[in-house]
């Protein structure tokens, strides 16, 4: 997961002298921790939520602002990937798609504890 830190002068004069920075935020090289994530969203509590797209069991994986990873959910239906994740505007429901059979789940919190 890459993180972009904008310049204090983003899109204004002075940006070239003090540009934003793209940095590697988290790179877990252990497929037991997270595998082939290709969708993400920001949770109401500030963590990232990643969707796995691996060859076996699929998870929703949380990433805290300091880079710690945790399992948030698991596809117990089949081994199809999660494809897209987002929270409702009020932050009470998480919506996530399972690619096959092409369904969307609405999952209610409570989410206040985060990871």
How would you label these PLM feature ranges?
Residues 1-115:
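Sequence/structural signature of beta-propeller domains
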């Amino acid at each position: 997961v890459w993180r972009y830190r904008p310049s204090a002068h983003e899109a204004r004069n002075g940006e070239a002298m003090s540009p934003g920075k793209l940095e590697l935020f988290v790179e877990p090289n252990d497929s037991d921790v997270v595998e082939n994530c290709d969708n993400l969203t920001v949770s109401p509590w500030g963590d990232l939520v990643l969707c796995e797209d691996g060859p076996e069991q699929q998870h929703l994986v949380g990433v805290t602002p300091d880079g710690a990873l945790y399992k948030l959910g698991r596809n117990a239906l089949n081994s199809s990937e999660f494809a897209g994740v987002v929270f409702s505007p009020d932050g009470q429901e998480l919506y996530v798609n399972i690619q096959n059979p092409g369904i969307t789940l609405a999952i209610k919190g409570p989410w206040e504890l985060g990871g």
